[in-house]
Each structure stands twice: as C-alpha cells, then as structure tokens.
C-alpha cells in the first residue's frame, strides 16, 4: 500500500533526520501497524518491541501504550500464548494505572484493547467466569471512556468466543454489537459482524447459505480480504453440515490458497480440522499451548473420528460420537 511504502521510505531516511526523535518513533509505529494489516506480523512485532524498549529510561506515553497494545493483540492472535498472556496484560494495566493520573492526554484506546484481549483470552482458555467478569468490566470501561465502538467490539468478541457454548446467546450479542458499527469508521466491523450473524443463523437453522454468501460478497466488494477468505472456511463448514463435501472442499481450497492465510496459526488449526474430515485422513496439528482447552478436545476428536461420514458442530456441554467441527471459524 501507499502508506506502507511511505513509512518504509521515511524509516530508511531517518538516519539523515535531525528533528525530534518522537516523529521517527511515530513513523515506526505506523509502519509496524501497516505490516500487521499486510500479514507481515513478525516484522511488525520486531518494530513494536523496538519502540517499547526505548522507554526503559523515559516516561511512558501514548506511543508506548499503543505499541504495547499491538504486542498484546499479536500475542493473542498467535494462538500460542494464551496461558502467559493474562500476566502480560496485568503488567500493562499496572503501568497504565501509574501513568494515567499524571497524563490526562493518554488515549484510552490502547487500554481498552488490552482489557478486551484479557476477556477473549479467558474465553480461549474456557475460563468462562473470568471472561464474564471481564465482559462486564469492558462494558463499564467503554462507557467510562465514551467509546461506543469499543462497546461493539466487546459484544462481538465475546459472542465469537462462546459459539461452542451457546449459539443463541452469541447471536444476541452479535446483533447488539452491530448496532454500534453503524458509523462510517466501523464499516469493516459492520460487514464482518453481518457475516458472523449470517453464519450463526445458519448453524442455528434460522439462516441460509445464500445469505452467508451475500455477506461474503459484501466483504469482497469492499476488499476486506482476510474476512473474505475466512468466510470461505465458514462456508466449508456449512456445506459439510449440508452433506455437500465437494462444495465444502472447494471453499476450503479457496481459503488455503492466498498468501495472506499462510502464516496464521489459527487458520492452520481450522484448515486441519476441516481438511481432516473432508479427506478422511488425519492432518497433523500440534499446539501445546492449547492443552486443557476445548480446542485441544476438538483436535483429539479429529484424530479419533476422521473416518466418520457425518459431522456435527462441537458443543462443550454435550458429547457426540460424530466428527466434531469447531464453530469458532473466525
């Protein structure tokens, strides 16, 4: 993108720059932020760590917390650090609580991002009581900081984390979340949320494959590529449930092909789960960070039941001898 190219050029030329160092640090931040959205996450993380390491001998400010919040977000999406992440987030919260009273200009967005990641991390670990406490905390914090969009993020992210527990409740939270995504700045979230709504409706038997496909088309038309390709995985699951293996395989292949989907650990997990059923052959997937979670139970089920001819949506409250598909396809 133009922003990415511009930031890279500015960073390269920074050795000749004699102005305030803060400006160069901000350029680095925007470069790393651009890398995150172009699926170059390791490069991005290196820059975010570089930014935060510069604050060992100086007061922490907005840039520090913004970079730390991005590190927290990347750790969550790495799909490999759930067990250590709550302690890391608590360190962030301690630093914030010390600095905030002294710096009224501190932006709340990074703090709200960190507390949101606490909630979804506990959902990933199946620590539902703690997740519910953080749901309520995040609602209060979003109201306190007058951040309507973060109310939407809270409701949507909570909903996605309970697909394997209560699809009906998840749908209510998704529909509530979408009410907060009606402003132009939240258009991507609105279309993403609409896609999740149609997917959950299908799983509940109240929606249709056609409505989910229309939601995917809207993502395509707006060039929201990651969400668009992830919807192929949703469609693959839906076609499996309909008994249409050929269509399911076609959508799996569409999701696996793009470069942007190659280095994502969560995508790897989902593709292995779907592919094992469609190929009737266990595709190896190992992630020690998931031990003891519902994700791990689903992985074990795929290895035991890969020869099953039918599949069901995994529900943590029920046991099924059929092949279990994780509904958390996002």
Predicted regions and their residues:
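Short coil/turn connectors between adjacent alpha-helices in alpha-solenoid helical repeat scaffolds
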Residues: 1-2, 33-45, 74-89, 119-131, ...
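Amphipathic alpha-helical segments of tetratricopeptide repeats
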Residues: 8-16, 49-57, 90-103, 136-146, ...
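Residue register of alpha-helical TPR repeats
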Residues: 26, 66-70, 106-113, 153, ...
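Structural register within alpha-helical repeat arrays
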Residues: 31, 71-75, 118, 151, ...
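Solenoidal tandem-repeat scaffolds enriched in leucines and small polar residues
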Residues: 93, 105-120, 124, 128-130, ...
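Eukaryotic tandem repeat interaction scaffolds
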Residues: 163, 167, 171-241, 250
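C-terminal non-catalytic interaction modules
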Residues: 224, 250-330
């Amino acid at each position: 993108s133009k922003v990415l190219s511009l930031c890279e050029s500015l960073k390269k030329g920074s050795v000749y720059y004699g102005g305030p160092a803060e400006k160069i640090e901000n350029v680095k931040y925007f470069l790393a932020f651009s890398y995150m959205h172009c699926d170059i996450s390791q490069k991005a993380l290196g820059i975010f760590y570089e930014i935060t390491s510069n604050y060992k001998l100086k007061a922490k400010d907005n840039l520090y917390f913004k970079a730390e919040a991005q590190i927290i977000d990347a750790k969550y999406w790495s799909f490999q650090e759930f067990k250590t992440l709550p302690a890391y987030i608590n360190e962030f919260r301690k630093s914030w609580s010390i600095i905030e009273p002294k710096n009224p200009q501190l932006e709340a967005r990074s703090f709200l991002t960190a507390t949101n990641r606490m909630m979804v991390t506990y959902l990933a670990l199946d620590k539902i009581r703690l997740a519910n406490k953080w749901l309520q905390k995040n609602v209060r914090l979003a109201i306190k900081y007058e951040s309507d969009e973060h109310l939407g993020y809270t409701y949507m992210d909570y909903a996605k984390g309970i697909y394997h527990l209560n699809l009906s409740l998840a749908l209510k939270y998704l529909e509530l979340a979408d009410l907060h995504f009606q402003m132009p700045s939240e258009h991507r979230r609105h279309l993403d949320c609409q896609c999740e709504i149609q997917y959950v409706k299908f799983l509940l038997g109240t929606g249709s494959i056609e409505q989910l496909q229309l939601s995917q088309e809207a993502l395509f038309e707006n060039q929201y590529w990651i969400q668009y390709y992830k919807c192929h995985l949703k469609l693959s699951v839906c076609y499996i449930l309909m008994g249409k293996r050929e269509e399911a395989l076609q959508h799996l292949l569409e999701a696996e092909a793009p470069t942007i989907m190659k280095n994502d650990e969560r995508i790897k997990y989902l593709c292995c789960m779907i592919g094992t059923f469609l190929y009737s052959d266990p595709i190896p997937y190992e992630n020690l960070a998931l031990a003891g979670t519902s994700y791990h139970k689903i992985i074990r089920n795929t290895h035991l039941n890969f020869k099953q001819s039918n599949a069901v949506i995994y529900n943590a409250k029920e046991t099924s001898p059929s092949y279990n598909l994780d509904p958390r396809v996002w």
